[in-house]
Amino acid sequence: MGRIAGVTAGQTRDRLLRAAADAFAERGYDGTRVADIAAAAGVSNGAIYAHFDSKGDLLTGALRTHGRRLLADLFAADPDRSITDLLLTIGRWLPRRRDASGYLIVEALVAARRDEDVAGPMRDYIGERAGWLAGLMTVAQADGEVDPALSANALAHFCLLLAMGSALVTPDLHAVGDDEWTALLNRVIAAVAPTRHHAEAGVMPQTEMT
């Protein structure tokens, strides 16, 4: 059983990524066999290796395609909305994270510690996400929403830690009230806002000064 009749190579790849995302989220990286993914996608094992170099490559491919990207989706839907408002919206959602994509990132992070086939692609994936977030922070700094004296890279790293942590510390392990969490987020946003001194001095974002 190779490629399904009437299905393009791109469609076959999409089917494999969907099947892989579901399998890894449900059974974990170690508990999922390539044969399981192939069977779920309705193709042969050979069809997988026509598109992906390894099981680890398939995991990171599934994460890129089906991993949660709510911030990017919100930004694309409303690019004129303030970035700090977008961050607050995502931040309020984090403690309630219970979707399959959350399990997918956990599996990828755990597998990356044990399997170099996963570690390399995951470094690339995290680097891409960090770069995108840092770019967003630079825009927020230029728009006067975030203190330009702060490192955009450090701000991006902070956001990544919150997002990854929310996938690990689920509400069934530790819950927090919506009101108290929102109050904390508002305090954090206020803390990274431009100081009066920097606003008056017109300090440039760090990423633009280097």
Identify the residue ranges that each predicted region occupies.
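Short hydrophobic/aromatic patch on the recognition helix
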Residues: 41-52
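Hydrophobic alpha-helical connector segments
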Residues: 61, 72-102, 152-159, 182
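Helix-turn-helix/winged-helix DNA-binding modules
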Residues: 28-29, 50, 147
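Short, solvent-exposed amphipathic helices
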Residues: 100, 121-128, 132-135
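Alpha-helical DNA-contacting segments of helix-turn-helix folds
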Residues: 59-66
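Basic, helix-initiating cap at the start of DNA-binding domains
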Residues: 1-27, 31-43, 57
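Hydrophobic/aromatic-rich alpha-helical bundle segments in the mid-to-C-terminal region
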Residues: 119-123, 127, 141-192, 196-210
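Amphipathic alpha-helical segments used for helix-helix packing
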Residues: 97-120
